From Swiss-Prot:
PROSITE patterns: ALPHA_2_MACROGLOBULIN, ANAPHYLATOXIN_1, ANAPHYLATOXIN_2, NTR. C3 precursor is first processed by the removal of 4 Arg residues, forming two chains, beta and alpha, linked by a disulfide bond. During activation of the complement systems, the alpha chain is cleaved into C3a and C3b by the C3 convertase: C3b stays linked to the beta chain, while C3a is released in the plasma. The alpha chain is cleaved by the serine protease complement C2b component of the C3 convertase to generate C3a and C3b following activation by the classical, lectin and GZMK complement systems. Precursor of non-enzymatic components of the classical, alternative, lectin and GZMK complement pathways, which consist in a cascade of proteins that leads to phagocytosis and breakdown of pathogens and signaling that strengthens the adaptive immune system. It is found in: Secreted. Gene3D superfamilies: 1.50.10.20, 2.20.130.20, 2.40.50.120, 2.60.120.1540, 2.60.40.1930, 2.60.40.1940, 6.20.50.160, Alpha-macroglobulin, receptor-binding domain. GO terms for cellular component: extracellular space. Its main location: secreted. The gene is C3. In absence of complement activation, the C3 precursor is first processed by the removal of 4 Arg residues, forming two chains, beta and alpha, linked by a disulfide bond. This is Complement C3. PANTHER family: MACROGLOBULIN / COMPLEMENT, NTR DOMAIN-CONTAINING PROTEIN. There is a cross-link at C986-Q989 (Isoglutamyl cysteine thioester (Cys-Gln)).
Length: 1673
């Protein structure tokens, strides 16, 4: 950084001092202070120093002496230890440094000061991952390329970098400290990490920051989700980027190519939709044939005009194209979608962002414009005309043509006028109204003296830039020289003087273009006139080809190779450059093209260092400097304004025009705009299949809306009936449709083959940049590999080579297609595709290896096999049906051998088998204080609900702060969903999310902990809060009250909650006083009763948001809650709102009058806090305090809390208890009793779930507020330094970790085996929080806890009659059937899900209707819900649901309320996307939003149930499945001897042998539970507690139960393996499988019967023998 100071003298005037310094300087950088001394004959001493802005602490100083005309440089180094003066806002970069130059000579003394904004961005780190997308449990590799800002080509060494791995919820899951070593030579390898098996899908980030710059992060992003690699890539390529409303057709090219460059032939099914944020409207669907990978589809304009006769109404929409391509070679299906195709009137957009808005009369004025298509892409080779007008006169009109980037430029020389009007317009072969046009006004430069810089604006590296400087002034003879500077990335890299040419002609400066000027630099020059006037100008020059030919890859030999082939690469680059290599499967980029490292991304990172704000000079002398990123200070008062922001001010954008929509049907035209939607919704067919009269019951609103809906609905019904009498055409299902549709989320990744490889580093150590040849071996994948080289050198910085594409293929090969996962016991198909690219046909034998625990069609132990003939240049599919019997990963191996040939192919991939049931999560938290040493235990027992023989994943995480886990989940919308683990999806969710974010910002600002979480998170949270505030204002009514939606009645409680949050938010963002005080005034005027209480006339939708407010003593708790909100706003509104204090006093009097009668714990707690806020010494406050203290509950661990009543109407106990305890904690903090408060905090900490939240929203928000207040109020900050040793002796698990101040906010989850106790040994000092979470599949009950709701779920096949008919078809939406490949492209089947529920109120309920109600539907394997149906159910005026969400195969549906007097029913379709049989039943649950534990759960399945073996099951497959079942021995079979039974009981692995009577049989989900009363214990095994008459559970799968045939109350001999789990009574339970022995065993009373006497003799001998000998013999 250079500080330029000029001292000028004249004979008649005092000398002038000029300081020009970059307005943003870098912490830790060298500040080169250039002192330019002119026209002096004496020595000048200059003392230059840098100071902290507020404290004036001297940071650095140097003294230099100038002699005559020689300039000098003083170098100051700013360290990294500059104190941050704004402790409460440590994430902000608004801190200044004062630079002072004191000039002394015999005749002159002057001190002048400049201020520069301090930037912490000392460098940038380019981060590269080995691919852009991963699945859970996959390893991520990354590397970093660190660069300096001052010199991006100087590789920093011996600095440390902090690397944070941040998950999709914004939580730091891992922190790594990396030291840049000299041996790294520019490429720092990160420590690879594995994504946890249980991870939320979304975008993860790797943040890397240099030491000394804690708030500047460089990042790389990657996506995490389950995905597949497609078989081939489909591309949609419109001939035009936009659809113009005057075009008659829209032509689209459809291309499809395999990733080995082979072309796909087949059929493309193309659908066109109009979208504007509402339900997509199908415009047209058609099919086209693909020949050699290419096909053509055309959308006629007339199709659009059928929906909107007025073409301009289409401008409100965008066009979406979806296509499904079915290959004729192998009947494989892939899809593509192109969204956001604009429908426009103008084809082009013209901007001039790089052109100055100020001109200098009689000097050249340079104008550069950028022309883009309406979709934002560059308009290449487009004719442009330009004219400049002065009044009515036009100056030199010009015609140009854009280059490949859409750029063109021209120069004019304007006369001496004050204003120019510049008009630039495209001149293509389109009508005039379709051209693009830009009109702007340029103003005259403010000074009467000018300077002009004439340069070539784009230069290549290595060229020499000729700069011509021209001065225009009436004092031209006084100008002797120019001073110029070259700035790049905010740094002055070059400065000098140039003597002015005699005669006033242009003075030439030659500037060699060097790498440090790339990718863009500024040239600024000025001269000084007598009297001190400074005349300046600046220009921006682009530098290209910095990386051209600096790094490249080439392949020796042919570019097409076979898998496993060795290849030789030539790597050409800069000498001594370090190069990182990477090869990625092109199919990966087809799945996700985002997050790739590109050269453009590197350039943009470098450009962010530029502190200038415009491309050219500003309005006047100071503007030229400030716009170039410089501060200018002179002793004559000509100064720039101190810079306040690192970035540039944003230019306000023009608001988009609002486009009206034409009514879409003539029926709708009969109604006014207000009620038109009512008619349109009536025209649509209901997904529920209900008639108009039934639908009418759900229509709310004015009578006109109801009438419009009914009339239009009846007309549509009549029309459908008339059309249904006509002929129907149905596309029949073709044979190829029996194959699975490839779906991105269901198909397994190619785990056997790498998706990326070649992750190595090389050094160009040879001369001329040629590296020794690199030899690599290709993986086995048939694909094209995208090989990339990234180079970092001292001369060029970071450069990327053009990708080298390596095709890996064979003439004959096979591909194995597997779903991502299947459930145990479900029948599915293994699909193998045989590709033959030879000319002749091949006869092939394809075999599948036998896999233990997977049933297939093998016979007598032989491999399943199929013989097939594949034509030349063709493909064929062979399938192997299987039924997996064991959970886990199984290797599926396929081999194909060609008859008569010596070649073949083989593939092995992993099939993931998941357990039955539904996923469940159990969590526990504990707060631990350590003084020196502490040992404690946590139970880690396996739940009795776990699916038999399935895995339990248990994770344990530790954080060194009670609030850490909660805080990091409060900073953005996605993370809050992790904090509050209940559904969100209605209007009030905005406040649910704003409140915790606000509290977190206040807390972290107060305790100055942003650095440990990540300083970038503060700006993100501020932005999120601002968006929330802006969004919440849309719910405000004209009278300043609030409701969930504008049309709903105003809610007192919600308005008060808004007041509370706004009062807090004002501490961190700008909240208009009227927006805060208006709601307070509304409450006081409209919602306060005569007795001082506040009332609620319009309840919120989220009644759960209210927490304990409401129910018994609701009028008291409501008044207390509202009073608290008004109290918090008092400092802002106490004066402006009339009757403010009077209202509060009346509310206090009301509460005081009720204290003695209060019974509910929650009401006591909130009332006490409200009274304490108003007057803690009042009699009512003391009285309520006594009540609160008397109701305190103490735990043995020293914790204290307040237990709410279990019969509470509003919430289940734990949530209300948390909320009451939070108010209790706030009360103790008001009394400054921190010792007791600590005990309360400990209890609250242990109530949290794994994500840091509690049971609901209000208790989470209140607990966060109270705990944060405790942390802020505590007198001293508790430091932490704790060593932990976590062990589980039963599982041989041991993990050691350390928690320090640096890592206290880092959450590192560790996987721990389930079962047994966990021992935690802690040593050191500090407090930490330990959280444990278990994730498992639990047995889905057929019904559960249906005391609050009833629920019915039925499934029916979708009826052909639901297909859209004629003109009403687009209203009804596409009714997709199994056969409709043209509509859906691979949907296997369509079913209708019918759901009915009813509320069952309790005696103490005050309402006969539920509050906000949720239905959670777990989707059947391979099925997805029909979104169009769901949207219609939500958006139509006969509204059936309030909202819906789809996450991770779970559909969540919201209702405002459910009645108790009748069933509330609706229906929607579900579509089968993956072929599967023997589908396991899954659950649907209904519950009240604010009481998620009280669920009513029902099982559902397809019609027919598929509980037994599928009728499609082949004989061999069925027999295999049956073999896995326990086989009941023949009844009273005397051929089975005593010895046979003894051997069976004593064989290895058999743990028990019991005789017991079956008391009960219960079906639970996919399993049957038998309750057995044990009569005789023959062999007890591990179950040492078992005795006769004891009860044990025996479990068998429902698919096996029919063969087993156990009956009540018969007696059986049962032998089998040990029980892995225990029931709720801590008793072992046993799974019956193929190793089990089940035999009917007669009771003694039956042994007198002749037909069983022989068998009974064997029975007695066996029992006696086992009792005497056991298994010892």
């Amino acid at each position: 950084v250079l500080l330029l100071m000029s001292v000028g003298t004249s004979v008649t005037q005092d000398p002038m001092v000029l300081l020009s310094v970059p307005s943003v300087i870098l912490i830790g950088s060298d500040v080169n202070v250039l002192v330019d001394h002119a026209a002096s004959t004496e020595d000048v001493s200059v003392v230059v120093r840098a100071e902290e802005f507020l404290t004036k602490k001297q940071l650095a100083t140097q003294t230099i002496t100038l002699t005559q005309l020689d300039p000098a440089i003083a170098t100051l180094k700013l360290g990294f230890d500059i104190e941050n003066p704004d402790k409460t806002n440590s994430a902000s970069t608004k801190h200044h440094v004062r630079l002072v130059a004191k000039v002394e000579s015999k005749s002159f003394n002057k001190e002048i000061t400049a201020h520069a904004l301090l930037s912490y961005r000392s460098g940038h780190v380019v981060v590269q991952t080995d691919k852009p997308i991963y699945t859970p449990d996959e390893k991520v590799k990354y590397r970093m390329f660190p660069m300096n800002r001052e010199d991006v080509h100087r590789i920093p060494v011996r600095q440390s970098m902090t690397v944070d791995i941040v998950n999709a919820d914004g939580v730091i899951v891992e922190r790594q400290i990396k030291t840049i070593k000299a041996t790294d030579e520019g490429i720092v390898d990160g420590t690879s990490f594995t994504i946890p098996a249980i991870s939320k899908h979304g975008t993860w980030k790797i943040f890397a920051r240099m030491s000394g710059a804690p708030n500047i992060n460089s990042s790389a992003e990657f996506d995490v989700r389950e995905y597949i690699l497609p078989t081939f890539e489909v591309k949609i390529n419109p001939k035009q980027r936009v659809f113009h409303i005057n075009d008659e057709e829209f032509v689209v090219d459809i291309t499809a190519n395999y990733f080995n460059q082979e072309l796909v032939s087949g059929t493309a099914y193309v659908r066109y939709f109009l979208e504007n944020g509402d339900v997509p409207k199908l415009v047209d669907s058609s099919s086209t044939t693909l020949v050699a990978g290419e096909g053509l589809s055309i959308l006629k304009k007339e199709k659009l005009l059928k929906l909107f006769p007025n073409a301009k109404d289409l401008l409100a929409f965008s066009l979406t194209i979806k296509t499904t391509v079915l290959s004729s070679q192998a009947a494989e299906t892939e899809e593509a979608e192109l969204v956001g195709i604009k429908i426009v009137e103008s084809r082009y957009q013209i901007t001039a962002t790089k052109t100055s808005r100020y001109f200098k009369p009689e000097l050249p004025y340079f104008i550069q414009v950028e022309v883009r298509n309406a979709d934002g892409s560059p308009s290449k080779e487009v004719d442009v005309v330009a004219k400049v007008q002065v009044g009515s006169a036009t100056i030199n009109p010009q015609k140009m043509r854009t280059d490949s980037n859409g750029l063109t430029s021209f120069t004019v020389t304007p006369p001496n006028v004050n204003q120019l009007t510049v008009t630039v317009r495209t001149d293509e072969r389109h009508p005039s109204n379709e051209q693009g046009e830009l009109v702007y006004t340029a103003q005259k430069y403010a000074s009467a003296s000018y300077m002009h810089i004439d340069v070539t604006r784009i230069m290549r590296l290595g060229e020499t830039l000729n700069v011509f400087l021209t001065a225009k002034t009436t004092q031209l003879n006084a100008v002797t020289h120019f001073t110029y500077m070259v700035l790049t990335r905010g740094v002055i890299v070059k400065t000098n003087r140039k003597t002015k040419e005699s005669g006033g002609g242009p003075s030439n400066v030659r500037i060699p273009i060097t790498p440090d000027m790339a990718p863009r630099f500024r040239f600024l020059a000025y001269y000084i006139l007598p009297g001190g006037e400074i005349v300046a100008d600046s220009v921006t020059v682009e530098v290209t080809e910095l990386c051209k030919s600096q790094v490249s890859l080439s392949l020796k030999g042919r570019p097409t190779l076979e898998p496993k082939a060795m290849l030789t690469l030539d790597l050409i680059g800069e000498p001594d450059a370090r190069v990182g290599l990477l090869a990625v499967d092109q199919a990966v980029y087809a799945v996700n093209r985002k997050h790739r490292l590109t050269q453009d991304r590197v350039w943009k990172a470098m450009e962010t260092f530029d502190t200038g704000c415009t491309a050219e000079g500003g309005a006047g002398r100071p503007g030229v400097f400030s716009d170039a990123g410089l501060a200018l200070i002179t002793s004559k008062g000509l100064n720039t304004t101190d810079r306040s922001e690192i970035g540039c001010p944003k230019v306000p954008s023009r608001k988009p025009r609002q486009l009206s929509m034409l009514q879409i049907r003539r029926e709708a035209e009969k109604y006014t705009q207000e009620f038109r939607k009512c008619c349109v919704d009536g025209l649509k067919m209901s997904p529920t299949g209900q008639g108009c009269e039934e639908r009418l019951k759900r229509v709310t609103g004015p009578k006109e809306c109801v009438d419009a809906f009914l009339q239009c609905c009846k007309k549509a019904e009549e029309y459908r009936k008339s059309e249904s009498l006509g002929a129907k055409t149905v596309l029949r299902r073709n044979d190829f449709m029996e194959l699975d549709l490839m779906n991105e989320d269901e198909v397994n990744m190619m785990a056997y083959f790498p998706q990326s490889w070649g992750w190595n580093k090389y050094k160009n150590s040879c001369k001329y940049g040629r590296h020794p040849q690199i030899r690599l071996q290709l993986p086995d994948t048939i694909t094209t590999w995208n090989m990339q080289a990234v180079s970092i050198s001292k001369t060029r910085g970071v450069c990327l080579a053009d990708p080298l594409l390596l095709v890996s293929t064979k003439d004959f090969f096979i591909k194995l297609h597997l779903p991502y996962s299947v459930k145990r016991g479900e029948q599915t198909e293994i699909r193998v595709i045989l590709y033959n690219y030879m000319e002749e046909s091949l006869t092939i034998l394809t075999e599948m290896d036998i896999v233990e625990s997977i049933c297939s069609t093998s016979k007598s132990g032989a491999k399943p096999s199929q013989k097939s003939t594949v034509k030349g240049k063709g493909a064929m599919v062979v399938s192997f049906p299987i039924v997996p019997l064991k959970i886990g990963e199984h290797h599926i191996s396929i081999r194909s051998r060609v008859y008569g040939r010596t070649f073949g192919d083989g593939v092995q991939k992993i099939l993931r088998v998941a357990p039955e049931g539904v996923r469940d999560i159990r969590s526990e938290s504990r707060s631990v204080h350590v003084e020196e040493r502490e040992t404690f235990f946590i139970k880690n027992e396996i739940s009795p609900d776990v699916v038999p023989n399935s895995d339990v994943l248990t994770f344990i995480s530790v954080k060194g702060d009670e609030l850490a886990e909660t805080m990091v989940n409060c900073l953005d919308a996605k993370s809050i969903s992790n904090l509050i683990q209940i559904p969100t999806g209605c209007g009030e969710q905005n406040m649910i999310k704003m409140a915790p974010t606000t509290l977190t910002l206040i807390y972290l600002d107060s305790v100055q902990e942003w650095e440990k979480i990540g300083l970038h998170r503060r700006e993100e949270a501020i932005g999120f809060l601002k968006q929330g505030y802006s969004r919440e204002l849309s719910y405000r009514k004209a009278d300043h009250s609030y409701a969930a939606f504008i049309k709903r009645p105003s809610s007192t409680w919600l308005t008060a909650f808004v007041v509370k949050v706004y009062s807090l938010a004002k501490r961190v963002i700008i909240v208009d006083n009227q927006e805060l005080c208006g709601p307070v005034e509304w409450i006081i005027k409209n919602r306060q009763n005569s007795d001082g209480s506040y009332r609620e006339d319009g309840p919120v939708i989220h009644r759960e948001m209210q927490g304990g407010v409401g129910g018994t003593e609701g009028h008291v708790s409501m008044t207390a809650f509202i009073l608290i909100g008004i109290q918090q706003a008092q400092e802002y509104c106490g004066v402006s709102v009339p009757n403010y204090k009077q209202s509060m006093n009346r509310a206090v009097q009301f509460l005081a009058s009720k204290v003695s009668d209060l019974k509910r714990m929650y009401t006591i707690a909130i009332t006490r806090y409200a009274l304490a806020l108003q007057d803690p010494e009042s009699e009512a406050a003391h009285s309520s305090w006594k009540k609160l203290e008397n109701r305190t509950t103490f735990e043995s661990k020293g914790h204290r809390y307040w237990k709410a009543e279990e019969t509470s109407h509003v919430l289940r106990m734990s949530a209300i208890s948390v909320e009451a305890t939070a108010y209790g904690l706030l009360t103790y903090l008001r009394k400054k009793d921190y010792e007791s408060a600590r005990e309360i905090v400990d209890w609250l900490t242990e109530q949290r779930n794994y994500g840091g939240g509690f049971q609901s929203t209000q208790d989470t928000i209140l607990a966060l507020q109270a705990m944060a207040q405790y942390k802020m109020d505590s007198s001293s900050k508790e430091l932490i330094d704790v060593q932990l040793e976590i062990t589980s002796p039963k599982n041989n698990f041991e993990k050691k970790m350390k928690i320090t101040e640096e890592t206290r906010f880092v959450q590192e989850p560790h996987k721990i085996p389930p079962g047994g106790n966990i021992t935690i040994k802690a040593s050191g000092r500090g407090t930490f929080t330990l959280s444990i979470m278990s994730v498992f599949n639990k047995v889905a009950p057929s019904s559960k806890s249906c005391s609050t709701f009833d629920l019915k779920v039925t499934m029916t096949e979708a009826d052909d009659g639901e297909s859209p008919q004629g003109r009403l078809g687009w209203f009804d939406g596409k009714r997709r059937r199994r056969r409709d490949i043209g509509d859906e492209g691979g949907v296997e089947a369509v079913y209708r899900m019918n759901m009915c529920t009813r509320y069952k109120p309790r005696k103490e309920d005050l309402s006969s209707e539920s509050g906000m109600t949720i239905i959670e539907v777990n989707m059947l394997t391979g099925f997805i819900p029909d979104k169009n149906d769901l949207i219609q159910l939500k958006e139509s005026v006969d509204k059936y649901i309030s909202n819906y969400e789809i996450t991770d195969s779970v559909l969540i549906i919201y209702w405002d309320k459910v009645p108790s007097t009748e069933d509330y029913c609706f229906a929607f379709k579900i579509k089968q996307m993956l072929r599967s049989d023997m589908i396991q039943p899954v659950t649907a649950s209904v519950y009240d939003y604010y009481s998620p534990a009280d669920k009513c759960t029902r099982l559902y399945n397809l019609p027919g149930g598929y509980v037994e073996l599928s009728p499609l099951c082949q004989n061999d497959l069925c027999q295999c499945v049956e073999v896995s079942c326990p086989a009941k021995k023949p009844k009273f079979d005397t051929s089975i001897t005593v010895l046979h039974r003894q051997e069976a009981a004593c064989v290895a692995g058999i743990d028990y042998a019991y005789v017991g009577i079956v008391d009960n049989r219960t079906e639970v989900g996919s399993f049957v539970y038998y309750t057995v009363n044990i009569q005789t214990v023959i062999k007890s095994g591990q179950d040492q507690a078992i005795q006769p008459k004891a009860t044990r559970l025996f479990i068998v799968t429902r698919s096996c139960d029919g063969r087993l045939g156990m009956e009540t109350p018969r007696q059986y001999l049962l032998m089998g393996r040990k029980g892995e789990t225990k029931d709720r009574n801590d008793r072992f339970q046993y799974v019956l499988d193929a190793s089990s022995w089940v035999e009917q065993w007669p009771v003694d009373e039956k042994c007198n019967q002749p037909n069983v006497q022989t068998f009974c003799a064997i029975k007695r001998e066996y029992e006696f023998s086992m009792q005497i000998q056991g298994c010892s013999s």
